[in-house]
Amino acid sequence: MDFKEYRQRGKEMVDYIADYLENIRERRVFPDVSPGYMRQLLPESAPIEGEPWPKIFSDVERIVMPGITHWQSPHMHAYFPALNSMPSLLGDMLADAINCLGFTWASSPACTELEIIVMNWLGKMIGLPDAFLHLSSQSQGGGVLQTTASEATLVCLLAGRTRAIQRFHERHPGYQDAEINARLVAYCSDQAHSSVEKAALIGLVRMRYIEADDDLAMRGKLLREAIEDDIKQGLVPFWVCATLGTTGSCSFDNLEEIGIVCAEHHLWLHVDAAYAGSAFICPEFRTWLRGIERADSIAFNPSKWLMVHFDATALWVRDSTAVHRTFNVEPLYLQHENSGVAVDFMHWQIPLSRRFRALKVWFVLRSYGIKGLQRHIREGVRLAQKFEALVLADHRFELPAKRHLGLVVFRIRGDNEITEKLLKRLNHRGNLHCIPSSLKGQYVIRFTITSTHTTLDDIVKDWMEIRQVASTVLEEMNITISNRVYLKETKEKNEAFGSSLLLSNSPLSPKVVNGSFAAIFDADEFLAKTYAGVRIAHQESPSMRRRVRGILMSGKQFSLDSHMDVVVQTTLDAGNGATRTSTTNSYGHTTSAAQANSERQASIQEDNEESPEETELLSLCRTSNVPSPEHAHSLSTPSRSCSSSSHSLIHSLTQSSPRSSPVNQFRPITLCAVPSQSQLSMPLAMPLPNRNVTVSVDSLLNPVTTCNVYHGKRFLEPLENLAQTSASFSSSIFRLPTPIATPTRESPEDPDWPAKTFSQLLLERYSSQSQSLGNNSSTESSSLSGGATPTPTPMSSLDELVTPLLLSFASPSQPMLSAHGIGEGQREQGSDSDATVCSTTSSMESL
């Protein structure tokens, strides 16, 4: 092939590559071939004479592509990303054409010089201390591009071994290196990558694995205990590997604690951030990097997530002389006149020759810039969050580990066999590709955002495939995953979890429950929209709306989980006021399909039946003097008296839907509650002082529903944000005040919070604005303001009392309700939030 033909074939190859990447979504992700398939397609010996290029290239599609696992496919979710980009491909095209071997500065000065600059750029981008950078010719630290993170780990372990042997000789002269090496011990988490174990095998040193905590992280305490125990046995601890972003679950070792322990015992601390290191270019993810100042080395792979194709691993060391001592060999033919002054990277690695990798990294950094790469990282995290929400919305699945960055691990509840069968079936179908992992004995599926082409539509499509195959597998195995859970079991999993998840109070039920709880019923279909968004194409019966309506109209008190599934139910005995409590099937317990179907049909029938309470309530709705459907609101009967120690009352506020028939006007959707003041160290109005908000979460603090009561608008807010803004936000289920339980004084430390209910504020406002209110109403309002228990008010009179007030509160032209009645300042501050509300709501609906 001459230059003329090369130009032609080169253009054809560029077109082929562009077409391949542009249309990769159409290809099957995982190949449908068997081992040895290619032997039948190719001859046993190489051709004697050369073949024309068209014939060679035609065999790419015929022979090679059928056996390719398409790592750039948006439906590829196995392993960690192995991304590429056009600037990266162009960089290696040029580097391969130049084909220089930059083992010394003299062998190719530009190769070495550009690598030094690129490594400084990358180090500054992820926030490394200056001690790790090439800042001057006298600088001891610096960075180098290695082939893989495995090689980087081995280099650092061997360097740490050399330093440890030298120090041992200084303290105890007379020992042979082999004798000292036999005593050396290295440490890592039991979640560390297999390359750490392989490095220890090559280095002929012992590797001790530290058990990870419940968050799958290695902590300083257990590491210190292991080190001290080994010292007592005459061993020599010398090296620790901390992992930031484990392969199994993307968990993070506590680098700060580990660094302190390593400093105490003078151990080499290596940080393996192969995947997560790319995310550190975003400042919000650098919290995991705290303690890096105590590390001796750190490595991550730009070839994983920074749009640079394989191979490219960035390694920084604090003391390059320790690496030089380990790999320093200088035969005469490798020496040059600048030896000792210029950087010779052959002393920083195991092989001698090295590729011009810095060129493609340089092309990518200049083409995308820091902001462009940050957008890419954040988009991957956003898509992983979307997938996490989809998994959480299906009760058959669970997340055995917290999601970090772009990796989600999930499994079907129950035996490992079910999840294993699901994964095998998914990979056999070939429409998406995932791999398994084992987390503390649980078989899990890893789902990683691995492609620059992945969109939300791809994520939804893959999730629908997973759900469909899961349904088939469960049906074949005659297994039904129960979505009900013993409250006792929930409390055992979380000691801080209270005695109830969520209290649902029927508007007509006079029963007494814990006075610290309140229920808000919202008929604006907010939760229905949210629920539909995260449970795409949800087809299970009974429907969410029917189930919640049936619960509320049944006259029973229920505890519910975050998916509105029954946990414990308490039924009032109308005869003597006693309660009866019954529990349901155990969490994750499997039942036969026939039994589950029978229970489901019974639940549907119960929900469809119109109870006497519902009939009476609908009758009141039709006969009461309620305004037009566009503005209709009503307030239910308050519950009977609670204990005097509680200053909050239970009320049910029902807002009718402006577009619904009378039957649906009392369709409660959002349920919220407030903890008693004994559970609070401070009022939790503090995080959002100018908003009336409610939060609904599950016992594991998974994603929540946050409602902002500004003119009927709603928005979502992550639980993490709330937890970070309030020190008293813990694992309690409802930790923010609702409009019907608000502070009564200016002081945020008011010990009597919450003291007033929504109806109390309504009555106070009515008293101040209406001269027509009789003495009885004034007396009742005064009694309520003092925190005393109100006399039960008949539905008709209460409806006549509050309807005009509800209409005025709902009107955008009216001031917002505050803890002291009406506050103009709150309404003005609330207007700024409205924009956020609209924006967030639109984003939520787009899901």
UniProtKB/Swiss-Prot annotation:
Compositionally skewed regions (Polar residues) per UniProt: 575-605, 832-847
EC number(s) per entry: 4.1.1.22
Region (Disordered): 575-662, 769-798, 813-847
Cofactor entry: pyridoxal 5'-phosphate
Binding residues for substrate: 80, 193
Modification N6-(pyridoxal phosphate)lysine, positions: 304
SUPFAM superfamilies, A to Z: PLP-dependent transferases
Similarity section: Belongs to the group II decarboxylase family.
Functional summary from the UniProt entry: Required in photoreceptor transmitter synthesis. Catlayzes the conversion of L-histidine to histamine.
Protein name: Histidine decarboxylase
Gene field: Hdc
